[in-house]
Design a protein with these regions (language model features):
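Catalytic domains of riboflavin
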Residues: 1-357
Length: 357
């Protein structure tokens, strides 16, 4: 019997948990049923309980657990359980910071332990699905007839998807500030989300190419949000490349520093409640930056570019791209004036994320 394709089985699992269904996550030793907290419903919770062998447990990032004051260890992922089971109210309070206005349920008798690799994979799957990084899990019955995904496939998904990227289309697209421009689309083997490369002018791969890694930003790029500087950076980068004669802007499907648009809007709501851009992500249970730069590096290699002048204010991008095998010969500052809505945001990026302005 042929082994399942890792990308295909992860994509199917993502589709299932995004609609609130239960999936089975397994390795060579154990098998868990998983239900994403973000899509929790009474019917599927009942199915999870009936299909398992024990009471469901909650698995979530150590970051979120620490911020709740439940545990102060350095666990990357924690498993929370209660002898009588975790109530729906408690699940919502623990996993969703936007439920913090509720009266906190009693957390007496709540037990916390390290998550093993299989349990950690459930949180990773929720992140891949762009859901809150929390899941209900229960040991699976051997006969459970539920869509299944290997934990090893979840862990390797990002790497395999990046290496499977291929160019699927290209068109000449004259732009406002760069009439000589082309847009190339790249898709992973599983038919997942596409990334784009905007090539301005005629490249000379023998020389370091001016490159901007730009994470898609619906609010800033498309509708002109003043909460960030993304729109200015997008259009400014294209104009600077046209002035320089050539360049590549990689438009990466990594909204909200990799957490997705829905979670970014949640982070905005938390910012309105007083958290800064970094702490809002942490409150949701994410890292301050969830982006993976391997897809960007792979696209550059497919275009034939291995040496770049990177247009960024973020030294972490320079390091990350270098770790992915692309030589960054120069960091090119990319600074635009702030406004009353994003001034604090930019200052936090400088103070907490090391951006250089």
């Amino acid at each position: 019997m042929a082994m399942p394709d890792p990308l295909t089985e992860v994509d199917r699992a993502i589709s299932e948990i995004r609609r609130g269904a239960v999936v089975r996550v397994y390795d060579e030793h154990n098998s868990l049923l998983m239900l994403a907290v973000d899509a929790l419903s009474a019917d599927y919770l009942r199915l999870l309980t009936q299909s398992g062998t024990k009471m469901p447990k909650l698995v979530m990032t150590g970051t979120r657990v620490n911020l709740l004051g439940i545990d102060k260890s350095d666990r990357p992922v924690s498993v929370l359980s209660h002898p009588e089971g975790i109530s729906l109210d408690l699940i919502e309070y623990l996993a969703n910071p936007l439920a913090a206005s509720m009266m906190p349920p009693s957390m007496a008798s709540l037990e916390v332990k390290d998550a093993d690799v299989l349990e950690q994979s459930c949180v990773t799957l929720a992140k891949l699905a762009r859901l809150l990084p929390a899941a209900l899990i229960v040991e699976a019955n051997a006969t459970a007839d539920i869509p299944a995904v290997q934990a090893s496939s979840i862990r390797s998904y990002m790497t395999i998807a990046a290496h499977s990227l291929t160019q699927v289309s290209e068109a000449r697209v004259p732009l406002e500030n760069a009439e000589n421009a082309r847009v190339l689309a790249f898709r992973p083997r599983d038919g997942g989300i596409e990334h784009l490369a905007i090539i301005v002018g005629d490249l000379n791969p023998a020389e370091p190419v001016l490159v901007r890694l730009h994470s898609e930003c619906f609010t800033g790029d498309l509708v002109g949000s003043l909460r960030c500087d993304c729109g200015n950076q997008l259009r400014g980068a294209i104009g600077e490349m046209a002035t320089a004669g050539s360049g590549i802007l990689l438009y990466m499907a990594q909204e909200g520093r990799g957490i997705g648009l829905v979670n970014k809007l949640r982070a905005y709501q938390l910012q309105d409640a007083g958290f800064d851009t970094v702490d809002a992500n942490l409150q949701l249970g994410f890292d301050s930056d969830e982006r993976n730069y391997l897809p960007a590096a792979q696209i550059l290699r497919l275009i034939g570019v291995n040496r770049v002048k990177l247009m960024t204010n973020n030294p972490a991008k320079v390091t990350a791209l270098g770790n992915c095998g692309i030589e960054v010969v120069e960091r090119v500052p990319h600074i635009y004036p702030s406004n009353q809505h994003n001034d604090a945001y930019l200052k936090v990026k400088a103070k907490k994320s090391g951006h250089l302005f």
